[in-house]
UniProtKB/Swiss-Prot annotation:
Exhibits temperature-dependent phosphorylation. The keyword Nucleus applies. It comes from Oryza sativa subsp. japonica. GO terms for cellular component: nucleus. The hydrophobic-rich region (HR-A/B) corresponds to the oligomerization domain. Residues 268-296, 314-380 are annotated as: Disordered. Keywords: DNA-binding, Nucleus, Phosphoprotein, Stress response, Transcription, Transcription regulation. This is Putative heat stress transcription factor B-4a. Residues 216-245 are annotated as: Hydrophobic repeat HR-A/B. Coiled coil: none annotated. Homotrimer.
Amino acid sequence: MEWEEESEAARQKAAAASASVVPAPFLTKTYQLVDDPATDHVVSWEDDDGGESASSFVVWRPPEFARDILPNYFKHSNFSSFVRQLNTYGFRKVVPERWEFANEFFRKGEKQLLCEIHRRKSAAATWPPFPPPPPPFFAPRHFAAGAFFRHGDGMLHGRLGALVTTTERRHWFESAALPVAPSSRLLSQLGPVIAPARRAAATPEEEALMQENHRLLRGNAALVQELAHMRKLYSDIIYFVQNHVRPVAPSPAAAAALHGLGVLRPPPAGGKAPASEVRGASGRSATSSSSLTVAEDQPTLLALRLPRTTEKIINEVSGGNGGGSTKLFGVHLSSADEQTSSGASRKRSPPQEQPPTSPAPKRTLVVEHSELRLSIVSPP
């Protein structure tokens, strides 16, 4: 008997609690606009069997629904916002062809069931944003001398025998305990934080590879800097040679020998080079041209030419086998000797005697009475 009284009291308490629960205003307003018979051409219950147990409603004309009906119940006229609110309360779209929504507690003629519809909690709310930090049981690590360790946008430099214990390092271990929510956006935000933590917990093999990688990077940077310096030095040398170094004419004996071998060609009779050669010599660099022209104060113009190709030399040697004389670079050795001797004799001609000039006065120093003085004494 007492047990029946207690059960009856529990039922009354549950009924009172259910009566005191008020459904969300959004659900009440949605039920009213769907249940209004004046707007059945825009939104209405979906009565498949024509009875009173419709469990879904259909928005037949979304533009008119957003323009004429939503402002009467809500503070906006945005149909997309209305659909998002339905999703948060557990409504689902029945068919993709039309805007039909259903919920097991949203039924025609059963308004009291709206108390059973609750708003969904967001997935991000289930994950604590900042969990309590773990106890500081991590021991500091030793780093090799001169080793670099990157952390985000900063860089740590370890010295020999020193311990790296900074706030950034402690932040690595605190960040390692952060939970990762199943959201791509949260993963992208936590990616830069988790990467240093994984790097801090690297194995000895990974640490050795990292140190080797940093050493190679430093060596590569040094080589690149040295290469840039050598390129600049090369450019300076080329500029100096092109602008400050002038070619030197060969000596008379060497010029005669080159002329005998056919390497050096004599200037024309008028003492001037053809206009094409002058233009070519002035337009080309003194160090990169194939023919070099040297102009001096005398009207002599010498042109150095490159030797002929090997193919021409072989053809001339093979063609000259039928003759009795030996050729070198297309020139008879006997004629070359004669030209050399004649050129040398012409170069050794004594210069013209010039009339003697009066001797210039000489300056001498004469010491008299421990004094120095300068006097000009004419020679006897």
